[in-house]
Amino acid sequence: MRRRRLLKGFASLPVVASTAVAANDIPTYAHGVASGDPDNNSVVIWTRVSGLRKSQPVSWQVALDDNFEQVVCSGVEVTNQYQDYTVKAVAKGLDSGRDYFYRFACDGVSSPVGKTRTLPTGQLEKLGLALASCSNHAFGYFNAYDAIAHDEAIDFVLHLGDYIYEYGATGWGAETALSLNRAHTPINEIVSLQDYRERHAQYKADSDSQRMHAAKPLLLVWDDHESTNNPWVGGAQNHQPADEGRWIDRRDIAIRAYYEWMPIREPNVGAERKNFWRR
């Protein structure tokens, strides 16, 4: 694709919605941008486009500078309701151990700019890692994410799981959530695909979380609460088949939402999404 054509999607605001999107469906980026799963020469970039009601192309760029005068790779992805209007792209052909900037555009509306980094190679004098886990929105403390975002010594964020929690209005943390005005969305325990999507959306809408995701690439693995508490192959401590259906269905729904909403690569050919390890 010619760079001139791609840049049309990154026009300055305000913009007039084209016929591709209805006038009352102007795209927004309410959940920010994120990057993750880097290797030595590529990284996943992510966003979600709100305000769409049908399939729509989304342009993206990766550059050496935040003014995007030195674009090194670009492309177009198509998003739709079947992926909850999330967008993921693997930016390839990058240099190892280098910072990059990225952004998206849909129907002339540009996303916030994110900053990411590829994994280094060879011997290192230092490497800055932030460790995060067990991030229950109900309890607050997401200001730790803001601190990570502003720490220039941190290169990558290693998130060891429990990125979201599944509980509802009467579950763990509910009283604290009410006192902090951080009640769960949706209010019920999450079971359906729409439930899991809404819970991920709540976490990604948090301003501290958005700052971290826009500033640092994540290395991710899930734990148990991305689906529900203490699962095993045949069920989970916090799953009641009589009321919540088959465990395997809930597990697969949770994994689908996770892949939609997180900056993580799709499994290699022949691998399954439920396998969180790689060869």
Residue ranges and their predicted role:
Residues 1-14:
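N-terminal secretory signal peptides and thylakoid transit peptides that target proteins
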Residues 15-20:
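Hydrophobic h-region of N-terminal signal peptides that target proteins for export
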Residues 21-57, 117-120, 130:
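Non-catalytic, glycine-rich low-complexity segments
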Residues 29-30, 41, 83-85, 110, ...:
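Residues that act as N-cap/strand-start positions at coil-to-secondary-structure junctions
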Residues 33, 113, 275-278:
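Short, acidic/polar N-cap/turn motifs at the starts of alpha helices
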Residues 57-126, 138-142, 146-147:
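Extended acidic/polar, glycine-enriched regions
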Residues 123-144, 149-278:
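Active-site neighborhood of divalent metal-dependent phosphoester/pyrophosphate hydrolases
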